[in-house]
Amino acid sequence: TFLLSGICALIQTFICAFIGYGFAKFKFKGNGFMFIVVLVTMMLPHQFMEASMYLKFRYFILDSTGIYRALGLTTGLINTFAPLIILSLTGLAFKNGLFVFIMRQFYRGVPDELEESSYVDGYGVFKTFFYIILPISVPMLITVFILSFSWQWTDTFYVNMFMPGSNTLLLTSSRFWQTMPTTLETIKNAQLIGASNAGDIYAVAVRNTAGFLVIIPLIIMYLFCQ
């Protein structure tokens, strides 16, 4: 869970900052329309695109070449971290529309004189972004990182959709892809199925304790980043 959340959060923070900077500082044809599309992604329920996204990664680009079969991947990119990482790289992951909006609003408040002075000193667009804009964006970048990490840490929707094989703890080949929220969900379901009336209180206590243990790393990270 830490590995997946950390990778996705780092990628999403950088990609959303890059996209937000483009929307805030560059005037190009279709800027307004494309930003509206970004806002619309914040309003669409995730279930609206569930089947489409699953099929895209189940039959990904290289599926017809036989490469996946050679690697032992019989279901495309399903049951790997690849779908979540690809969505993060393209700015289409969970809540990325919100992150782009946050970064755009922040960069709109950055004085244009900073960029103009860097251009006079011979900096290009990318060098200006990396050496001038990113250093002054650290507080906002940390905010986006915390939000992205915490949402990925507690996610069950995308994990269950792209890694359905990780839902059973009995499949040792899938243990690497198991995340804590899905483990907690598995425990909950097992208890609900097997618990008797006399054991209900015990089942609830175990479930609540497990839920508390899951959020402890988030609390520690928040206190550290504060």
Regions found by a protein language model. Name each.
Residues 1-226:
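A structural signal for multi-pass alpha-helical bundles of membrane permease subunits
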